[in-house]
Amino acid sequence: MRIIETVSEMQQQADDWRRAGKRIGFVPTMGYFHEGHLMLMRKVRGEADMVVASIFVNPAQFGPNEDLATYPRDLDRDLRLAGEVGVDVAFVPQVGEMYPDGYQTYVEVTKVTAPLCGRSRPLFFRGVATVVVKLFHIVKPHVAVFGEKDYQQLVTIRRMVKDLNLDIEILGHPIVREPDDLAMSSRNKYLTPEQRPLALRLSRALKAARARVALGERNGSVILKEVKELLDAGGEVRIDYAELRDPATMEEVGSMDGPSLLALAVFVGTTRLIDNCILRPAA
């Protein structure tokens, strides 16, 4: 596996591959890999001739009081794991390479970014959209894969690609879970042994909602009331949001007449965790 650190070298490699008729697959990451990341790489490996994974902790998507300084990092391990799953190039730029002195251009996707994470993290999606469109221009992929745990992010990227006429296929990959059903996340590392059981309320709340819908419940308020009661059952858990949204538009859903995104975000202690599922009412 080749390691590339500069924009110019990555662009040159991408140009060489494209001239040779190679299909480029891409997985953008912030590193500290878990099985979820590796599943994305395996998926794109089956979709492309050459695979690039980027490792870049993007400062533009962190707010002033968020965990940029403490976000977990282990580059040597990440590079080893990426090589083992068949990544051809790891693109590992420094902050100054992506945002040199004088940088002043940002990409903003409206509407789909307004609720949920966009409401509680106002700079997040501007930072995500900006870095992803930059990476697309640098890596020049034909196809890119994103995890569905960050469902609103996936919708945002698809909207951006459509609106900016980018010729890139965007694929989603289902949430990958730990054996205890906690959605895999680099931030799970922050949880203490005492907090881990509290974090499992997320997946339990999703299961309860699915069961409610399977029994015929269509009233969003009823479903959300039960979900919030399960999440807010004492201990150091604070709900950021628990909402039903249209999976394509991110508009709020009251009565479920079709598939609906149940999106959850909670703080367990100081660690913010997200999870989601698509609720599908029976016809």
UniProtKB/Swiss-Prot annotation:
Transmembrane segments: none
Cross-referenced CDD domains: PanC
Catalysis performed (reactions): (R)-pantoate + beta-alanine + ATP = (R)-pantothenate + AMP + diphosphate + H(+)
Keywords: ATP-binding, Cytoplasm, Ligase, Nucleotide-binding, Pantothenate biosynthesis
Domain of life: Bacteria
Signal peptide residue numbers: none
Gene Ontology terms, MF aspect: ATP binding; pantoate-beta-alanine ligase activity
Pathway the protein acts in: Cofactor biosynthesis; (R)-pantothenate biosynthesis; (R)-pantothenate from (R)-pantoate and beta-alanine: step 1/1
Stored Gene3D superfamilies: HUPs, Pantoate-beta-alanine ligase, C-terminal domain
Residues annotated as the enzyme's active site: 37
Extra information: The reaction proceeds by a bi uni uni bi ping pong mechanism.
Protein family (similarity comment): Belongs to the pantothenate synthetase family.
Record's protein name: Pantothenate synthetase
Natural source organism: Syntrophobacter fumaroxidans (strain DSM 10017 / MPOB)
